[in-house]
Amino acid sequence: MSKIVKIIGREIIDSRGNPTVEAEVHLEGGFVGMAAAPSGASTGSREALELRDGDKSRFLGKGVTKAVAAVNGPIAQALIGKDAKDQAGIDKIMIDLDGTENKSKFGANAILAVSLANAKAAAADKGMPLYEHIAELNGTPGKYSMPVPMMNIINGGEHADNNVDIQEFMIQPVGAKTVKEAIRMGSEVFHHLAKVLKAKGMNTAVGDEGGYAPNLGSNAEALAVIAEAVKAAGYELGKDITLAMDCAASEFYKDGKYVLAGEGNKAFTSEEFTHFLEELTKQYPIVSIEDGLDESDWDGFAYQTKVLGDKIQLVGDDLFVTNTKILKEGIEKGIANSILIKFNQIGSLTETLAAIKMAKDAGYTAVISHRSGETEDATIADLAVGTAAGQIKTGSMSRSDRVAKYNQLIRIEEALGEKAPYNGRKEIKGQA
């Protein structure tokens, strides 16, 4: 009864007011799966292609009617009659039919929406929650954990209209005993941060990922105000709550230098910027740094890994773009020690699971992540639990596109109880 009988694609709106692709997969037994593709702002150059129409008279060129047409046309034709439970087979048909290295014919947004909708339909057909089905697809049935959230409470870079160069300043409630408690701790710090910023006469408007986006005197000041908020909330920094950053350094890499415009155009070499970050880790309990250099600066990353890699988690996002070919090369060259996992960078569930497995097999951690352009689709919560990835990045404590994922984690934890432990600090590379 898990035979696909109908596939529907449609254009919906994401959290930035831009169109994205939503797909429905209908099965013979009456079960339906529905999923939407997210969209990034700071994107790696080697990501799978997000197909946009380019018609400036409609959605400023960002329409996705071509990708939707691919779902309703060739993809639907190829998949009708196939077994939804064969996720790898379904994804392979779409990838082969597209025939390009970066999914540029149909768009990764089209293929991913169908891939995830198919997984949801198959889970429904099997009478199980999505996380349980994902664990089976992953070859790890019944093995779950609740992820430590990385909560992006100060937004900068491409995610905010402010003068802060580093894109994300995050808290990790590592001292919590459950994900529900971790979310409460994050919420309390978030609200205390608003009070701290207001007391300093700073803006408390939020950025794309729901964190505050004030103008600050320096990148270090973001860490200082967060430290103040953690203390005001009654928590101990470094014990109850640790810090993480996403530099998204490719966004301020210009002519071979790392230029911090918000700090008077200070320019750094790869080595100098590594030591700039190292100093911050000495001043604050920063346990994870993502994209600490430009995605193409592999020599710099090798140096950064040598300097910081045995002390903290170094996460590759633009660096690896959830791509097993690139990750394999990084593992062989000893670049970073963790990978950020974003479905739409690679464009299918099967390839996403392959990247998580490769990372884990090599002793790298995997951090499951949203994109800055999101929808109410909470699939990443199920992915994090179903692969026992251990960490999740899904924004701050505001905007329902972010909070939807936290609420799903609360529901999953309630359902699984002790079968899905919250392991806190030991999930983070170098912190066990």
Curated annotation (Swiss-Prot):
InterPro entries documented for this protein: Enolase, Enolase-like_C_sf, Enolase-like_N, Enolase_C, Enolase_CS, Enolase_N
Cofactor note: Binds a second Mg(2+) ion via substrate during catalysis.
UniProt entry keywords in alphabetical sequence: Cytoplasm, Glycolysis, Lyase, Magnesium, Metal-binding, Secreted
GO biological process, one term: glycolytic process
GO molecular function: magnesium ion binding; phosphopyruvate hydratase activity
Cofactor(s) the record lists: Mg(2+)
Pfam families listed in its UniProt record: Enolase_C (PF00113), Enolase_N (PF03952)
Annotated compartments: Cytoplasm; Secreted; Cell surface
NCBIfam families: eno (TIGR01060)
Physiological role: Catalyzes the reversible conversion of 2-phosphoglycerate (2-PG) into phosphoenolpyruvate (PEP). It is essential for the degradation of carbohydrates via glycolysis.
Subunit structure: Component of the RNA degradosome, a multiprotein complex involved in RNA processing and mRNA degradation.
Name this polypeptide is given: Enolase
